[in-house]
């Protein structure tokens, strides 16, 4: 049934009215289902973004983010913008005109990293891997050997477009051996698989709230190492974005009671993020990772029993984002449309060169549970005629 937010008045004019969305089961690549507890936090009374109580919430949110990132980095914040802005913030702060940056691409989002490097006036050296494979550390080593002036390595930990995990620990260690900093995309990995910022030595790490954290979209958790902060503070050129300039943002998220006004933070969205991080802390990171993996294995077993094939080898699969090969003769859009309209179930289409070839089934955060696994399998059996 199509819902409309418009009605026709007596004089024939269109009138808007309140929007009441249906209750979907969100099993795509994000956003994921948001719990009633987080939605309840979102609806609490708004207070000022410099209110002493809100400052306390900011400090506690920072500590919770340090917990999930496994870091002691002082500059750990939820950027007041979505994950794509987190990506841009990492690049505009750490990349200067004329720099050489090694960018790993094994899916859509590595390509977006390249765009950011070039918009900063720097040179992107591309390390290409097949979409569906992890980043090959040997290729990265060869890129550093060919470009010894490279001062930054950028890669995606969990490639959202393909459902592939890359070996972030090895890649960060490789960059350190070449005196290069790292920018790491963890939009899909944070909260779903292990992420050890300090142990791995990652320098600028960004994520999103709408995936394994099961919060509303619109914020980008970020963390910067002391080495990254030093590079930001010692730049020879001004950061090209005022809003994303971490030297200014640090004044608002700093560790003292005198906060410098930079922008009006999305107060209620931060209530929601704080609540979602509390839920994750209560469960425990290891328990969250185990839950995601158990539900992933159950889903894969059911899909393979239907004759469907997974697109990624088991070692590198993301438990929170399952890439499934679309059977020959099956119309991608028709299947997804029927799932949505007959079962209120959303799964994702393939992106880029994988459009029409793969489905992406998310088991992220609050949505990663046995009930959703069985509902998804039942719906697919019905739609595919199994």
Predicted regions and their residues:
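Active-site C-terminal subdomain of aminotransferase-like
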Residues: 33-34, 210-301, 305
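A glycine-/small-polar-enriched, mobile loop at the entrance of the PLP active site in fold-type I
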Residues: 23-80, 84
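Conserved beta-loop-alpha segment that forms the PLP phosphate-binding cup at the N-terminus of a helix
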Residues: 72-102, 106, 110-114
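Conserved PLP-binding catalytic core of the aspartate aminotransferase-like
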Residues: 309-342
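Conserved active-site segment immediately N-terminal to the catalytic lysine
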Residues: 198-210
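Active-site phosphate-binding strand-loop segment of PLP-dependent enzymes
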Residues: 134-191, 204, 212
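PLP-dependent enzyme catalytic core of the Aspartate aminotransferase-like
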Residues: 8, 353, 357-386
């Amino acid at each position: 049934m199509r819902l409309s937010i418009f009605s026709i008045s007596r004089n024939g004019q269109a009138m808007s009215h309140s929007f009441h969305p249906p209750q979907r089961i969100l099993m795509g690549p994000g956003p994921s289902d948001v719990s009633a507890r987080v939605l309840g936090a979102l609806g609490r009374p708004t207070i000022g973004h410099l209110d002493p109580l809100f400052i306390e919430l900011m400090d506690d949110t920072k500590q919770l983010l340090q917990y999930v990132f496994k870091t002691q980095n002082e500059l750990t914040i939820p950027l007041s913008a979505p994950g794509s802005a987190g990506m841009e913030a990492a690049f505009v702060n750490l990349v200067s005109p004329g720099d050489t940056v090694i960018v790993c691409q094994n899916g859509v989002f590595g390509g977006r990293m390249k765009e950011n490097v070039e918009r900063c006036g720097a040179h992107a050296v591309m390390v290409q891997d097949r979409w569906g494979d992890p980043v090959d550390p040997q290729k990265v080593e060869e890129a550093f050997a060919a470009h010894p002036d490279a001062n930054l390595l950028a890669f995606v930990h969990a490639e959202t477009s393909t459902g592939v995990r890359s070996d972030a620990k090895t890649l960060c260690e490789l960059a350190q051996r070449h005196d290069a900093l790292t920018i790491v995309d963890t939009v899909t990995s944070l909260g779903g698989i292990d992420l050890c910022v300090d142990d791995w030595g990652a320098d600028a790490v960004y994520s999103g709230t709408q995936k394994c954290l099961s919060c509303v979209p619109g914020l980008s958790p970020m963390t910067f190492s002391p080495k990254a902060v030093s590079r930001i503070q010692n730049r020879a050129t001004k950061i090209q974005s005022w809003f994303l300039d971490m030297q200014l943002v640090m004044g608002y998220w700093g560790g003292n009671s005198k906060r410098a006004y930079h922008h009006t933070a999305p107060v209620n969205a931060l209530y929601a993020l704080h609540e979602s991080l509390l839920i994750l802390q209560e469960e425990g990171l290891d328990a969250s990772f185990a839950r995601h993996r158990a539900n992933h294995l159950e889903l894969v077993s059911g899909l393979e029993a239907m004759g469907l094939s997974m697109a990624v080898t088991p070692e590198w699969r993301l438990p929170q984002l399952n890439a499934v090969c679309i059977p020959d003769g099956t119309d991608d859009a028709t299947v997804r449309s029927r799932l949505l309209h007959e079962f209120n179930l959303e799964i994702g289409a393939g992106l880029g060169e994988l459009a029409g070839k793969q489905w992406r089934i998310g088991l992220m955060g609050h949505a990663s549970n046995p009930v959703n696994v069985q509902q998804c399998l039942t719906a697919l059996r019905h739609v595919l005629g199994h």
